[in-house]
Amino acid sequence: MQQPMNYPCPQIFWVDSSATSSWAPPGSVFPCPSCGPRGPDQRRPPPPPPPVSPLPPPSQPLPLPPLTPLKKKDHNTNLWLPVVFFMVLVALVGMGLGMYQLFHLQKELAELREFTNQSLKVSSFEKQIANPSTPSEKKEPRSVAHLTGNPHSRSIPLEWEDTYGTALISGVKYKKGGLVINETGLYFVYSKVYFRGQSCNNQPLNHKVYMRNSKYPEDLVLMEEKRLNYCTTGQIWAHSSYLGAVFNLTSADHLYVNISQLSLINFEESKTFFGLYKL
């Protein structure tokens, strides 16, 4: 039998003694060259490698671990659908009730408005029946007067302008330079006179408001101002005198303004005036 020649030493041959060979005598054995005697320069061959263990037969595939059975879902998880449905149903019912309440309130409000309007109409009609309307009475005009300076005034007491410019009169009368009271009450009376001159001679300046009534034997002075040394001698000068106070006047009282120097008065309507108004 043939053996591979590259197999490592030593090799073992089985020799059959009964076999004959044309190239060797029977019983002869050809030892391995390494088994013969070594010379002094020859080295011993390395030991043979350890025998290789035979490969195990192909193993069977490992069995798969048994599948763990899935846990059954909790029975409570199946209740979420009915719960959600119930919540939606409750919300819809609440919305419906709210809309019904709103509609009902609007209806009641409309009925209340209609009832109120009818009540007002009935009340107004009853008042008209109980108190029939009478022609509206004209309210008495408020007692007020404002008279301005009259440059044509040449006598005492002073005469005034009661028609033109800023002059006005209502609720009282103007008669011969005086204001006649028609209604008893409290009045604020005022008067302003503007004096001026080209040269100063220091003559006394008198300005007064007085009242005249048939009940009194003499005139009653209400307000008065008297000025001295109001200018420098020989120079142009000007002086303004103002009087004003509240008085309790009665019907038929006459009010006048008197001054001492008629020729020294500036009769411009913004500088000299006389008036009153009822409080």
Curated annotation (Swiss-Prot):
CDD domains: TNF (cd00184). One of its GO terms (molecular function) is cytokine activity. Changing residue 184 to A: In strain: BALB/c, DBA/1 and DBA/2; enhances cytotoxicity. Cytokine that binds to TNFRSF6/FAS, a receptor that transduces the apoptotic signal into cells. Involved in cytotoxic T-cell-mediated apoptosis, natural killer cell-mediated apoptosis and in T-cell development. Initiates fratricidal/suicidal activation-induced cell death (AICD) in antigen-activated T-cells contributing to the termination of immune responses. TNFRSF6/FAS-mediated apoptosis also has a role in the induction of peripheral tolerance. Binds to TNFRSF6B/DcR3, a decoy receptor that blocks apoptosis. This is Tumor necrosis factor ligand superfamily member 6. SUPFAM superfamilies: TNF-like (SSF49842). Changing residue 273 to L: In gld; abolishes binding of FASL to its receptor.
